[in-house]
Structure formats: structure tokens, C-alpha cells
A protein has these predicted regions:
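Histidine-dependent nucleotide/RNA phosphoesterase domain, centered on the 2H-phosphoesterase fold
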Residues: 1-170
Length: 170
């Protein structure tokens, strides 16, 4: 029996070009040590759920299944933090109830579709770099406002991200 083809998928808030530019500026405010790997500007996003490898044959079902109603919300990203293992992130100043409600609704949807949400606690963030060592986080600048009116199902393949479907607010 041959190996089943899979797609590496995640659900995310996907920034528009203007917001992506501001996120890139925030990423570039860090002074990265040698060996750090800043995230390419085209890949900056806020993950809602990482699904991992999913059988590609399930994509039609999942594309429709991930459409859940939600209310738009506003994020204020403005807390640069270095996480363990050299992960540099930009966290929101507060976790909007709308973001947490969307995350919870998508968790329920994952279970209904026979997929398992991650067990670890949800910590919303935008990853700025990996292998950042012990870099000092820059002084917080003005918060970056993110008016979220949609989320996306994204495929990661060979280092490239492709938005498979955008899900606007209800």
C-alpha cells in the first residue's frame, strides 16, 4: 500500500499588505544575532490552530468545514518577547474576547471534523524569528492595530505558504 499524500495545514489570521508591512517593520526593529532566522515578511501571520499533516483527500471537506461564524475584533500587537528555545514573537497587549471565541469555535470544529486541537494552552502571537538565541527584545513601539475580519486556511509546502481559503466574518 502506497503512502497517502498529505498537506501541512494551519488556520491563521492572515494580514493584508499594509499590515504585513507594519509587521515587517516590527520584525526589523530587533537586532538579530548571527544564526537567527527572521521570518520572511510574506509568512508573517497569527496562528489560530496548527493542524499538521492532513490527508489531501480531505481538503474539500475541510475547506467547507472550517467556515464558522464569528464577529470581527481588533488586536493590538505591541509586546516583543523572547520565548524559550530562541523564538522571538510579537504578542498582543491583551487577548480580545473575539479572538478567544474564534479560537474556541475552531477547536470545536476541529473535533467535529475528527481532528485534534493542540493540547498546549493557546498563546496568540506573530513569530518574528527562530534561533534568536538570547537576543534582547526591542523597546515596545506603538501598538500595531489589526482589525480582523477574516481568517484563512493555509497550506505549508516546501517552505511556501498558500492561502487555500479565506473565511470572512458572518
Amino acid at each position: 500500500m502506497g503512502q497517502q499524500e498529505t498537506s501541512r495545514l494551519f488556520l491563521a489570521l492572515w494580514p493584508d499588505p499594509a499590515l504585513r508591512h507594519r509587521l515587517r517593520e516590527a520584525r526589523d526593529a530587533w537586532h538579530w544575532p548571527r544564526g537567527a532566522t527572521p521570518v520572511d515578511a510574506g509568512k508573517l501571520h497569527l496562528t489560530l490552530h496548527f493542524l499538521g499533516e492532513v490527508p489531501t483527500g480531505r481538503l474539500p471537506e475541510l475547506l467547507d468545514g472550517f467556515a464558522v461564524p464569528f464577529e470581527p475584533f481588533r488586536l493590538a500587537l505591541g509586546r516583543p518577547v523572547l520565548w524559550p528555545h530562541g523564538i522571538a514573537v510579537l504578542e498582543p497587549l491583551a487577548e480580545p474576547p473575539g479572538l478567544l471565541a474564534l479560537h474556541a469555535r475552531l477547536s470545536e470544529t476541529l473535533l467535529a471534523l475528527g481532528l485534534q486541537p493542540e493540547a498546549r494552552a493557546y498563546r496568540p502571537h506573530v513569530t518574528m524569528a527562530r534561533r534568536a538565541g538570547s537576543v534582547a527584545a526591542p523597546e515596545p513601539g506603538p501598538a500595531i492595530g489589526w482589525d480582523s475580519a477574516s481568517y484563512a486556511l493555509v497550506e505549508s509546502r516546501a517552505g511556501r505558504y498558500t492561502v487555500l481559503r479565506d473565511y470572512p466574518t458572518s
